[in-house]
Design a protein with these regions (language model features):
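C-terminal scaffold of the Radical SAM
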Residues: 5-7, 28-52, 56-332
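Local cysteine-cluster metal-coordination motifs and their immediate loop/turn environment
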Residues: 15-26
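Short amphipathic alpha-helical interaction segments
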Residues: 331-344
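A short, conserved structural fragment
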Residues: 346-356
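Minor-groove-contacting beta-hairpin "wing" of winged helix-turn-helix DNA-binding domains
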Residues: 357-361
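Short, amphipathic alpha-helical interaction segments positioned at domain boundaries
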Residues: 363-377
């Protein structure tokens, strides 16, 4: 009888885009064809060199960036071929590609489908062209609509659309209009993030007219209400899906499934080992697969580290965490470890326990950052 393989997720970083957006702090930027070719060689060498997970089964792959759809489709096809030759894939593995409007065409999409991509995540951010311009996006809303239609025509039956609230000069009415317009297109999944102005980005240097905290809270509360009207359920702080279409890759992160990340700045968790790849692209290219030069911040997680992650990642999901699973993993009853914190937030009606699960309430979700920080021992 075959031994059951452990589930594994793979993340592939493609650090190229047409132009960096004003709010982006990811390791990304424009790249020439020669740079992309050099990067592909280094990426394939890293995948070849990785020794972990020979006994695992890949349940999801996520190509992020940057903008993976901005590079030659052949690169992504070759990387997928390399991954399939190295790892065992489950029959129904979820394989996602991040894409931006203005970088997709019929040929590329056919290529993606042929190589096994079955989910596409398209960055829209807003249906208002003036908001897109402020964000430094390369596309209009009309171009997003065209890309969405092309993806459907190419056979993508699982499409996510990214939206952003809390934008400069954004009103509640404009946010609601973005939500309803996208929901009416009927994607399977919507990710609705609040803008965070990160240090070192162009936005950080500007004096922005941002919505106040009360307006942002109202925008957040309305998001779940509006999307529910269109058949979307909230399964995580920023994610909404039609039944059966919650992103399995994201859920894997929140449940601490093993994952390996390839490319500069990519993070990995395998067993109780965690590491992050160098964010220095030139160093990554020179290393050409030498893992000792690529991997940084390697650490062995203690049981306490793992407990903390179990709580603050698991409680991001609306279904919360299983108290029995906590005890099974750590050999301790959850109230013996976190009793004080649990009582505090249950008394404030921000956390609830029901049928062996602990989850944030609707009010708890809106102040989740404060609550989750309290689970650090």
């Amino acid at each position: 009888m075959n031994k059951k393989r452990k589930p594994l997720e793979l993340y592939v970083h493609i650090p190229f885009c047409i132009r960096k957006c004003a709010y982006c702090d990811f390791v990304s930027g424009p790249g020439t064809k020669a740079m992309q070719k050099e990067y592909e060689e280094a990426l394939l060498a890293e995948i070849d060199a990785a020794e972990e997970a020979a006994e695992s089964e890949v349940i999801s792959v996520f190509f992020g960036g940057g903008t993976p759809s901005a590079v030659d489709a052949g690169m992504l096809v070759r990387v997928m071929e390399k991954l399939r030759s190295k790892y065992v894939f489950s029959e129904d593995a979820e394989i996602t590609l991040e894409a931006n409007p203005g970088t997709l065409d019929e040929e590329k999409l056919k290529c993606y489908r042929k190589s096994g991509f079955n989910r596409i995540s398209i960055g829209c951010q807003s249906v208002h062209d003036e908001e897109l311009k402020r964000l430094g996006r390369i596309h209009t809303f009309a171009e997003f609509q065209e890309s969405f239609a092309l993806a459907r025509d190419a056979g993508f039956a699982n499409i996510n659309v990214d939206l952003m609230s809390g934008l400069p000069e954004q009103s509640e009415e404009k946010w609601e209009e973005s939500l309803r317009t996208i929901a009416e297109l009927s994607p399977e999944h919507i990710s609705a993030y609040s803008l965070i102005v990160e240090p070192g980005t162009p936005f950080a240097e500007q004096k922005l007219d941002l919505p106040d905290e009360d307006t942002e809270r109202e925008m957040y509360a309305r998001t779940a209400e509006i999307l529910a009207e269109y058949g979307f359920f909230q399964y995580e702080i920023s994610n909404y899906a039609k039944p059966g279409f919650a992103c399995r890759h994201n859920i894997g992160y929140w449940k601490r499934t093993d994952y390996l990340g390839f490319g500069p700045s990519a993070a990995s968790l395998f067993g109780n080992c965690r590491w992050t790849n160098t964010a220095d692209r030139s160093l990554y290219l020179k290393a050409c697969g030498a893992l000792e030069k690529i991997r940084e911040d390697e650490e062995i997680l203690s049981r306490q580290d793992a407990m903390e992650e179990f709580m603050f990642l698991g409680l991001r999901m609306t279904q919360g965490i299983s108290t029995a699973e906590f005890e099974e993993q750590f050999g301790k009853e959850i109230h013996a470890v976190y009793g004080g914190v649990l009582k505090k937030y249950e008394a404030m009606h921000l956390l609830q326990e029901h049928s062996g699960r602990l989850a944030l309430t609707r009010d708890g979700i809106s102040v989740s950052n404060v609550i989750l920080a309290d689970f650090l021992l």
